């Protein structure tokens, strides 16, 4: 069954649900497109005062569906695909309503980065965060590294990106990546309570407070994402990525040259 991304409304609160539970809500191109359409639709609903983003099953999202990596179904260059993806997710910044992410299970790769572009993140106990992109011969390219740099500093970001190690919920709380940790059974209720509190506040005050925070963050994020687009395009055309793919097909150790 193909994964889906669903949108539902409960009064002034909208909920986005990642629904590919058999694959820990890993995203493919169709789910990306559905997500971007949903963000566009939310921009047309000014009555929405808060947005919850959650996942069905055991995880928020394990990132990219590895079965779809390298599978191109549209006639666009890699650079154009990245630009489309950036434009799609940057719609988060254009929403008047804050977005609260319910983190649980695995929060990985591009989905981890997308969560970092949102306003508030709450983690269930046992949540694990990871940026495994280098293992697949690519770099993180969804803007989250810029957010992590501000939160954690260059040392922790380098450790996470270059080793792909797992960060647990307690460490994430210590760095301010999440603002609360709750038992998993209480996660949905907790984020809904936060959404209700925000939705009950004066809407213009929420909008302006969010605008001030975004004014501080977005310029750096745009710059970071522009760099990611350039460097990821270079990586995609590099000798090393070609060698990685050839070695995988030929079942041998790769020999990288750094070019």
Region locations from a protein language model:
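Amphipathic alpha-helical segments at domain termini/boundaries
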Residues: 1-19, 23, 165-199, 207-216, ...
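Conserved CoA-thioester-binding segment of acyl-CoA-metabolizing enzymes
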Residues: 1-56, 90
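Beta-strand-connecting loop/turn residues
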Residues: 12-13, 58, 127, 230
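Terminal peptide-recognition signature
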Residues: 16, 20, 35, 53, ...
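Glycine- (often His-adjacent) and acidic-residue-rich active-site loop
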Residues: 40, 47, 55-91, 107, ...
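Crotonase-fold acyl-CoA enzyme core
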Residues: 90-204, 229, 237-238, 242-243
């Amino acid at each position: 069954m193909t994964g889906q991304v669903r949108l539902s409304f409960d009064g002034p609160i909208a909920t986005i649900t990642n629904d590919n539970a058999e694959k820990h809500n890993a995203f493919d191109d169709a789910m990306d497109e559905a997500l971007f359409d949903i963000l566009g639709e939310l921009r047309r609903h000014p009555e929405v005062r808060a947005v919850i983003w959650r996942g069905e099953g055991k995880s928020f999202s394990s990132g990219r569906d590895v079965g779809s990596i390298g599978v191109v179904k549209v006639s666009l260059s890699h650079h154009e695909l990245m630009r489309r993806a950036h434009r799609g997710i940057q719609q988060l910044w254009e929403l008047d309503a804050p977005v609260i992410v319910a983190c649980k299970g695995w929060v990985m790769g591009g989905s981890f980065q997308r969560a970092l572009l949102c306003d508030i993140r709450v983690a269930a106990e046992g949540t694990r965060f990871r940026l495994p992109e280098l293992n697949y011969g690519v770099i993180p390219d969804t803007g989250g590294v810029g957010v992590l740099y501000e939160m954690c500093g260059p040392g922790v970001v380098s450790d996470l990106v270059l080793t792909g190690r797992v960060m647990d919920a307690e460490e994430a709380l210590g760095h301010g990546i999440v603002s609360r940790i709750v038992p998993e059974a209480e996660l949905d209720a907790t984020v809904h309570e936060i959404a209700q509190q925000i939705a009950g506040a004066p809407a213009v005050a929420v909008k302006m407070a969010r605008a001030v925070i975004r004014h501080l963050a977005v310029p750096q994020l745009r710059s970071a994402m522009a760099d990611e687009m350039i460097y990821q395009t270079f990586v995609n055309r590099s000798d090393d990525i070609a060698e990685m793919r050839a070695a995988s097909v030929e079942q041998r150790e790769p020999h990288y040259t750094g070019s």
